[in-house]
Amino acid sequence: MVRELKHMEIGDIPVDWKLQTFDETFRVISNNTLSRENLNNRGGAVRNIHYGDILTKFPEVLDCNEEEIPYVNELSLLSSSTQLLQDGDIVVADTAEDETVGKVIEVQNLGDSKLVAGLHTIPCRVKKGDFAPGWLGYYMNSDLFHNQILPYITGIKVSSISKGAISKTLILVPPFDEQEKIVQSLNKIQLLMTTETKVVNKIKLVKNGCLSKMFPQKDDTVPKMRLPGFTEAWEQRKLGNM
């Protein structure tokens, strides 16, 4: 059966999907301005989302139980206005060296841990709309949303997006059960990607180990690891003599 569509500002969407502005959907909450040197990976009372991790490390939906999130070195570094994040909050990276500016993460599975948003981020909390966990993280990293940001990016060497500009973007709100189905499908893909990445990383370690053992070390003439049938010493020649 062909699904009935309606034409909206961002294109044709299903008739039972809603559209609302970023401003209608979110309220911006307070972040901090801590740089990487104020963070550590050893431990602490409060963890901090750095914009660089949003751009290069974190997936669209940040599982706080699984991802390594740096800690604030000292609580005294946090201003009293900094607000703790909650499940369902989104954090936008407002600065980058390219058009990845505007990448978003959605916070999930915080549990009892404390988390804040750091330098060059725009943390936001939903004030209108019923969203399935994960929907905003996936939707706001789609081309449909990110392309809305592109006209508002400023800067030459460093790209940035302002709170005022991002407030003009539009948020799609499908029926809740459809959001859940879409998120479930994308979660399966993300899990597959994560699993395959771990396998590839293990293979890379094996390869690097082979590279270090299958070639002679300095001042040696035989490698530590050899293939069957090879026992002779290796020769070393200058490239110009070959």
Where are these regions (language model features)?
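Short amphipathic coiled-coil heptad-repeat segments
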Residues: M1-P14, T195-E235
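A short glycine-rich beta-alpha junction/loop motif
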Residues: V2-K6, V15, R36, G43, ...
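Non-catalytic DNA-recognition/assembly elements of restriction-modification systems
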Residues: R3-T33, K168, R226-M242
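Sequence-specific dsDNA recognition surfaces
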Residues: K6-H7, D23-N41, D53-I90, G240-M242
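Short, well-ordered beta-strand elements within core beta-sheets of diverse protein domains
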Residues: E9-D12, N73-L77, I122-K128, K168-V173, ...
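A short beta-sheet element
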Residues: H50-G52, V61, E67-N141
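Short, surface-exposed secondary-structure boundary micro-motifs
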Residues: A96, S185-N187
